[in-house]
Amino acid sequence: MSVMASLQDRTDGTFAGDEWGEKDTRFLYGALNALSLLRLLDLVDTELAVKHIQACINFDGGFGTSPGAESHSGQIFTCVAALAILGRLDLVNKDKLGGWLSERQVPNGGLNGRPEKLEDVCYSWWVLSPLAVIGRLHWIDKEALIKFILKCQDTEHGGLADRPEDMVDVFHTYFGIAGLSLLGYEGVLEVDPVYSLPKTVIDRVIGKRSWT
């Protein structure tokens, strides 16, 4: 874990993905996720990490990969989840962000990652997770999204694709099922929206959280 902690830049709070230094909020979230589960957040400067996340907030309430980068659902997940881990959800404009995220739903019920892009099953997680954390999950049409996700199934061999009729893969299968969990779909184990792990596991490891 000391290696992971060493990847934080102590001048601006960012985290690199490796020794060669590429930085963005994905690496920040990944580090905070792992360190918090091991109760080792004291190895990094969490206040500086929060300041960096604040610098990534955009006028539309969303977050980008770095300060000034456009809002994207995947990066919003990493930033909101990181703030949840650090107990700083007070920094999120929940109504503004909830509005931007709910606008990601397109007419066929699916969700896209940013304006004018195609829908994709994986955004059933990247969009729904922050909506769940900020208490705005009811701002989308849940039934329409469930229908879209189920249409992306390979009913013969199993699995989920990014869109109906496309090839299934593990990535989209996982995030599609995780999205169904957040939607309360019957028979799917409850997933924690911050850690993307079974809620029973998170409750056992670090206790019940305020966002659940």
Where are these regions (language model features)?
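Core helices of alpha-solenoid repeat scaffolds
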Residues: 1, 9-12, 46-50, 94, ...
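Hydrophobic, ordered structural segments
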Residues: 1-14, 21-47
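Register-specific detector for alpha-helical tandem repeat solenoids, activating on a conserved position
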Residues: 2, 29-32, 51-54, 77-80, ...
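Glycine- and aromatic-rich loop/turn segments at beta-sheet edges
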Residues: 4-21, 53-74, 98-122, 149-167, ...
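Residues within HEAT/ARM-like alpha-solenoid scaffolds
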Residues: 22-26, 44, 70, 74, ...
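Tandem alpha-helical RNA-recognition repeat domains
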Residues: 23, 36-39, 71, 84, ...
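Alpha-solenoid helical repeat scaffolds
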Residues: 26, 30-33, 74-81, 126, ...
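Terminal, non-catalytic domain-edge segments
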Residues: 82, 87-107, 119-212
